[in-house]
Each structure stands twice: as structure tokens, then as C-alpha cells.
Amino acid sequence: MPERTMVRVDEKQLPRWTRWLDLGDRLLAVLLLAPAAILLSLIIVYPVARLVYTSFFSLSLTSGLPAEFIGFENYTAMFDDPIFWETTWNTVLITLITVPGALFMGLGLALLANLPFSMQWPMRLSLLIPWALPLSFAGLIFAWFFHYEYGVVNDVLNRLGFEGIIWFNSPNWAFAAICLTIIWKTSSFMALMILAGLQTIPRSLYEAADVDGAGKIRRFFEITLPLLKPSIVVALIFRTITALQTFDIPYMMTGGGPGTSTTTLAMYIHQNTVSFLDLGYGSALAVVMFALSMCVTAVYLRIIRTKD
């Protein structure tokens, strides 16, 4: 069979009508992408740009004064604001506790839901319940669960012979209750993401491992976990970003109390913009939270590229 050779042809040597056809294809691609690009700009780019712009102004609706350009004063004021540092630390701490907690709990639930048994669908259906519940509704439910007099948690403790805990009067216990609620609420998302990854692992790999005499633990660490890496990383990125923006559950359970011990950065932004109507400082806080989320995403992506 004769060998085929590839000949590179200069675009200038092609007929003019073929060059116009190629230009038409490019123009068509631009026209098809234009609506999505415009919509993305209206939904994301413009609000972020407007947020950054407003953060350089002193804009308080309660003062009745017009907006005044003050440069970076809103940002420098954060360094002298103890509540900013406390709420930022609370947000970081919630992220460090709830993201790994939801990951381990979600991994266990996904492995359980992936087991081959006859009643598999109720297990998988139950994973959707926490995920489908609105965050504010979950906060209200667990606020009742942890209620000192009528809560289910204290009722169980009393039946076991322990004294009930006044959960929301103590900063530490209130913080623990919020973290437990967030882990319960978000572990189902982790489980669904990991379960989707488990479904893509070829069964032949496990059969080959059985032939080689590999045990369950070895199969998990050498087959399951490495192949789940893409699903886990995507879930971690989404979950970390949402953890840094935690608002609904602590707002509904404690309102940020006692004091500001459970107030998150998102709640502090809401307080400044909605309660105090200080749009300038609130916008600066929101820019910091946005930058923090982008930094975390960049770190995750850098880790992925380094390991690959």
C-alpha cells in the first residue's frame, strides 16, 4: 500500500472563496457565543466591576451625603476593625472544619450507596433529601433540634443520663452546633459527586485486582481513591467556595451570637450593607471575600496541575 504524505498548503495559495468560507465559520462561531458572553457579562462581570468601583467610595445611605471617592480607605479601615478579623477567622474555621467533615462523611455515604444490594435506590434517594432542603430551612430545623428545652439532641442526652446543653448560650457549643448542621447539609452534595465518580470506574479493574489477590483496603487506596480524584477535587472546590460564603445556617440558628462569636464574613457584609446601609465599606468587605474565594480556587487548580 503506498504511503500517504501530508502537504502543508499556505493560506495565500488557496482560492479566495475558501478563505471567505473560513472567515464565515469564525464569524458564525463568534455570533453563536455572543449571547452567552453578553449574559455572562451582565450576570458576573458587571456586578463584580460595580462592586469594586463602589468599594472606593464613602457611600452611606443613612448620612444623606453624596458618594465621595476615598480611595483605599475602606480597605485600610478593615485592619483596625476587630469584628472584620473575628468574622474572617470564624469563616475560615468553619471552612476548615466543615469541608473535610463533609468530604469524609460524603465519601462514606457514597461508598455505602454504591454497594450492590437490592434496596439500593432508597439509599440513593435519601442522599437527595439534605441536598434538596433550602439552607435557611435546614438552619431552622436544626435550631429546633438543638433547643435546650424541646430539642431532640438534649432529649437524647437526657435519656442517656447526661445533662442537657444550652447550645446557643455558649460560643463554643453554638459554633459546634452550626458546624454539625453544615456538615449534615453539605455531605449529601459530596456524596452525590463522589457517587457519580464511582459509577465511572470500570468493573474490570476490580476483577483484575481480585485475580492479583488484592484486598478491599488495597483496592480502595490503589484503584478507587486515585480514580475518584477528579470528582473529589471538583466537589472540594465548590464546597470550599460555598463554605467561605456561609450565611444562611448561622443566620437562622444563632443570628451570629452570642455576641459575634458565630458571625461569618458574609453575615458581616449583610449587616453593613442591609442593616447599617454602609454600601462603601460593605462593598470592600465583599471584594475581600470574593478575592479569598478566587485564591482558594487558584490553589486547588495549582495543586491539580502540579500532581498531573
From Swiss-Prot:
It is a multi-pass membrane protein. Residues 88-300 form the ABC transmembrane type-1 domain. Gene3D superfamilies: MetI-like. The chain crosses the membrane at residues 28-48, 92-112, 126-146, 164-184, 223-243, 279-299. Its main location: membrane. SUPFAM superfamilies: MetI-like. It comes from the Bacteria. PROSITE patterns: ABC_TM1. GO terms for cellular component: plasma membrane. Keywords: Cell inner membrane, Cell membrane, Membrane, Sugar transport, Transmembrane, Transmembrane helix, Transport. It is found in: Cell inner membrane. InterPro entries: MetI-like (IPR000515), MetI-like_sf (IPR035906), UgpAE/MalFG_permease (IPR050809). Belongs to the binding-protein-dependent transport system permease family. The complex is probably composed of two ATP-binding proteins (SmoE), two transmembrane proteins (SmoG and SmoH) and a solute-binding protein (SmoF). Part of the ABC transporter complex SmoEFGH involved in sulfoquinovosyl glycerol (SQGro) uptake. Responsible for the translocation of the substrate across the membrane. This is Sulfoquinovosyl glycerol transport system permease protein SmoG. It comes from Agrobacterium fabrum (strain C58 / ATCC 33970).
